[in-house]
Every structure is written in C-alpha cells, then in structure tokens.
C-alpha cells in the first residue's frame, strides 16, 4: 500500500471496494492498490495513471463525509456520463472473464480498422469501460 500522491485525481463512488478491486485488479489486471489512509479517512482504492489517480471510494463513506451528496446519489445513478478508457493485455481472456461474470457488454470484442482490438462494457457499478489492446502487427505512425 502506498499513500495517494498524484497531482490530480478523479474520485468515483462505488458500492463495495472488494467488488471494484475484483473487477479492475482481478479481471482487467490493472495496478489497483489499496492506499494508506489518515486516521478517520475512508478506505479507498487507487489506480495511478501517469500522474493522474483514479480513486475509488465507497458511496456510503462519501455520504458519511459529505451528507449533502446523499440526495445527489439517490437522484443520479453511478456511471452516468462517465467513460473510462484502458489499454489492457490479453483482451480475449478479459472478454471471456467479463462474460463469465455476467457483466453487461455494450459492444463485444472486435478488431477495429485502426489497429486495435476493442470492447465496451459496464463495471459492477455501471461505469462505462472501454478496453483496447494494440494488434501485434500494428505499425507506429511515421514508420
């Protein structure tokens, strides 16, 4: 575990950290870490993306710390208007795991004409997640 030190961060409210961790770290194999928290601060997960941290906090903890947000969370479902893009490895295995878990797939895995394999799905909290993996024979621009 390490302390959250990113210069910029985006915080997403989730139902259960364990479920979120199982999806992002377990299925997507992204480097999600449980971060150290100050006394009294809520437990959270952090995904460092080149200096920008994606921070996952349980919704109940957010509402406890900021009661005024309780109404907002009840009016607007999680995930509305948010799309998370990740480059992953072994996208075929990930696609199979997402299907096995019964998570909703918006667009199944397909090869795109611009040199990637891509799929769109929803995470356990309803956030739209776009996954892609470069094709092995993809050429870099200018080569």
Walk through the language-model features, giving the residues of each.
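Vicinal oxygen chelate
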Residues: 1-9, 31-85, 93-122, 133-143
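Conserved active-site tyrosine of GNAT-family acetyltransferases
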Residues: 20-25, 98, 126
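Short glycine-/small-residue motifs
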Residues: 128-131
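Conserved active-site region of classical short-chain dehydrogenase/reductase
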Residues: 18-21, 92
């Amino acid at each position: 575990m390490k302390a959250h030190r990113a210069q910029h961060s985006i915080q997403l409210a989730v139902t259960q950290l364990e479920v979120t961790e199982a999806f992002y770290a377990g299925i997507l194999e992204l480097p999600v870490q449980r971060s150290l928290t100050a006394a009294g601060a809520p437990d959270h997960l952090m995904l460092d993306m080149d200096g920008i941290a994606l921070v996952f906090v349980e919704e109940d903890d957010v509402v406890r710390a900021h009661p005024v947000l309780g109404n907002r969370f009840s009016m607007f479902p999680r995930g509305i208007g948010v799309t998370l893009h990740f480059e992953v490895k072994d996208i075929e295995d990930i696609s199979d795991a997402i299907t096995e878990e019964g998570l909703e797939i918006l667009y199944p895995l397909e090869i795109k004409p611009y040199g990637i394999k891509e799929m769109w799905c929803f995470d356990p909290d309803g956030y739209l997640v776009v996954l892609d993996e470069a094709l092995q024979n993809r050429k870099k621009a200018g080569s």
